[in-house]
Amino acid sequence: MNECSRRPFYSEYAWAFDLLIDRPVRKECAVIAAWLVDRGALPGSEILDAGCGTGRYAIELARRGYLIQGIDLSPDLIEVAMRSHGDVHRGVSFAVGDIAHLPSSRYTAILCRGVLNDIVDDAGREAVFAAFAGALQTNGVLILDVREWAASVERKAREPLFRKRVSTERGELTFTSVTAIDHETRRLLISERHELLTSGEERVSEYNFVMRCWERDELDTLLARHRFGELSYFGAYDSGVAAGATDRLVVVAQRTGAAA
């Protein structure tokens, strides 16, 4: 799992992460907060943002009254998050940490966005779900999202290339990602390239890595094994988007019994 923290995206270019990946954070956090309240996790509850990245979701949820702890394997992303929390410093904290090793029965809810695709082995996936179950209080809420295999194959076969160019204080930055599909292992083979042009000099970083997509049956099995029930599936952080409508699976679940 430490492999992820070596990606230039998460290390030397962590400072540019939010420039390259634009998410509707406030809109999605409004939905997340509504789901939390619906499951009994009210403002004032302690929530873990597992794999928090630059902390934007943690900070927004703290503004909505939650007590948020964000952890990530990348020290560089955590450094960005700690510089960004601004006026909500009393409601949010950040630390380098491993989502497979969590304190027992501490949290009312856990949020895990886009992280679980980076765990490619069965044992690692099992360990993370065991950690989530152990870290949640009884009736605690788990909200996560993953890439769904069949829809991801369809999308990446149609759109294998992603490129974005942004102007930054450090120069012109071009990010390119190319995805190939390994059907046999149900994995995405991804090649990333950062090109930073500063004062006529170009710096290039390249990195290849693997993502393993998910299928709903696998999620159902792991959630049931670790005593999660009351499952709701969506295709986005939007109650109006049905599962299967996008290449994402968003799951809201509740820990219904003692951890396995």
Where on the chain are the PLM-derived regions?
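Conserved class I S-adenosyl-L-methionine
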Residues: M1-G51
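Class I SAM-dependent methyltransferase SAM/SAH-binding core
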Residues: G55-A100
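A short acidic, Gly/Pro-enriched loop at the edge of an enzyme's catalytic core
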Residues: L102-I110
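A short beta-strand submotif of the Rossmann-like class I SAM-dependent methyltransferase core
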Residues: C112-V115
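A short glycine-rich, Lys/Arg-flanked "PGG" loop and its adjoining helix->strand segment in the class I
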Residues: E126-T138
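C-terminal lobe and adjacent flexible extensions of AdoMet/dcAdoMet transferase-like proteins
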Residues: V210-A260
